[in-house]
Amino acid sequence: MAFTQKPLPFDPGALEPHGMSAKTFEFHYGKHHAAYVANLNKMTADTEMADMPLETVITESFKDPAKSGIFNNAAQTWNHTFFWDSLTPSGGGGTPSGAIAAKIDSDFGGYEKFKEAFKTAAATQFGSGWAWLVLDNGTLKVTKTSNAENPLVQGQTPLLTLDVWEHAYYLDFQNKRPDFIDNYLANLVNWEFANQNLAAA
């Protein structure tokens, strides 16, 4: 069984009005994400991991330093799919609604405090990595991870993510990562996706 790259949940040009160009997706989805999937299939071919769910490959390979290459490509395959779903071209960003809004109010003390925590995590992740909104033992938290690592290996439930590898923003925002973060929070966050993940947790 081969791992597959899921289609983007929107047209590659759909986020142009919100600061993310089709050119970015041409490279980010079409080259970077595709390469992680291809590498994962090469590394797991003819092994028991080829038939495991992707999440299982991630958690199992994380435990074995000899499988770091498999982990990196499996996690990046999953992380990118989750990131695309964390974006929406219609009605994204701004203050959330529904259950996630109430949970943010109770666990962070309001949306503005969540926003500052998320901006800080994303901006201070040194080098490549990810910022996450997760559910950890029933409580919402903001976390950041380096390189390919994700909250699954810590037993946390991811609700949203932002990719802060340079290739995620350099074509559109150059070296201005804080502007990329602000734009994500203001215009692109898919709160409906976060609500779905919270409901399923």
Regions found by a protein language model. Give the residues of each.
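Feature for soluble, non-membrane regions of globular proteins
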Residues: 1-201
